[in-house]
Design a protein with these regions (language model features):
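Basic, polyanion-binding surface patches
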Residues: 249, 254-276
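Extended, domain-scale alpha-helical bundle/helix-rich regions
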Residues: 76-249
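Generic N-terminal leader/targeting and pre-domain segments
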Residues: 1-73
Length: 276
């Protein structure tokens, strides 16, 4: 099977949402370093676990790959087609073991942006998704349903108190450390600095933290002509003259109002066409 060239994989990686938003390191060597650590921890989890996987959803994906020849073919080919660059996934078992470990951990802050991985599953699949086999694989409903169950498993962990271990005051890797406080302007949020874990009950509780009423007032509140994102995040792109419909598919260049607004009535849609 022909491998995707290194330059093409790198170009896809640099255009990925994770890199542009700062959730994945721009330097791919940082991604490789993360994989090396995850692989070691995943091997330890597998050794402790014994036969099978720690998470049933990962075991179900393993069973799907074993019993569905089409899924197995595309998974194997997608991994093989990344071999022109740093092969961060060695084989199917390695992919499953890394997934199994990811489901039992929360994203750690890292003051060094070259080593920061805040989207672990995106980090795992970013190269596979750039390959011809990967593009076919991630369109297969059985594979996507299996991944959905894995994401739900991981979400349950992130909603649990077990995920609070990353909410610490470490200067370099703590979400409540001085570096993170400055970078993410945590003083603007409702945080109980006297309580353990800042008073948060889980990583997701911290991730969805409340902004203090006196900070960042909402512009255009009550004005139906304005759409304001309620999320606190990184601006991905500012676009003008957006059309009613466009080929956009993968967060690249064009945006489609019809799709972003979930097929609204024509009158509402036209209010935003080519708006600035």
């Amino acid at each position: 099977m022909t491998s995707v060239t290194g330059p093409l994989l790198d170009a896809h990686y640099q255009r990925s949402f994770g890199v542009l938003a700062g959730y994945l390191p721009e330097d791919r060597s940082g991604l490789a370093a993360w994989h090396a650590v995850i692989r070691e921890k995943a091997a330890q989890l597998r050794n402790d676990q014994g036969p099978g996987y720690a998470n049933q959803a990962v075991q179900d994906l393993a069973n799907l790959i074993d019993t569905n020849g089409i899924v197995r073919m595309y998974v194997a080919e997608a991994i093989d087609q990344t071999s022109a660059f740093m092969k961060n996934i060695k084989n199917i078992q390695d992919m499953l073991e890394q997934l199994d470990f990811i489901c039992t951990t929360a994203p750690e802050y890292n003051v060094n942006k070259k080593l920061r991985v805040l989207f672990p599953m995106s980090a795992l699949f970013v190269d596979m998704m750039a390959t011809p086999a990967g593009k076919a694989l991630f369109r297969l409903e059985p594979f996507n349903e299996a991944l959905r169950a894995i994401l739900q498993t991981w979400a349950a962990y992130l909603d649990s108190q077990a995920s609070c271990w990353v909410l610490n005051r470490d200067l370099n890797i703590g979400w409540l450390g001085t570096a993170a406080i400055a970078e993410f302007k945590l003083a603007d949020f409702v945080i109980d600095w006297d309580a353990e874990y800042g008073g948060f009950q889980s990583y997701n509780d911290f991730f969805h933290r409340e902004i203090q009423a006196s900070c960042r007032p909402l512009a255009g509140e009550g004005d139906a002509n304005i759409i304001t994102s309620p999320n606190d995040g990184t601006v991905y792109r500012i676009a003008t003259d957006v059309q009613q419909s466009a080929v956009f598919w993968i967060k690249e260049q064009s945006y489609s109002l019809q799709d972003m607004l979930a097929n609204p009535d024509a009158a509402l849609l036209q209010r935003f066409v080519e708006a600035r």
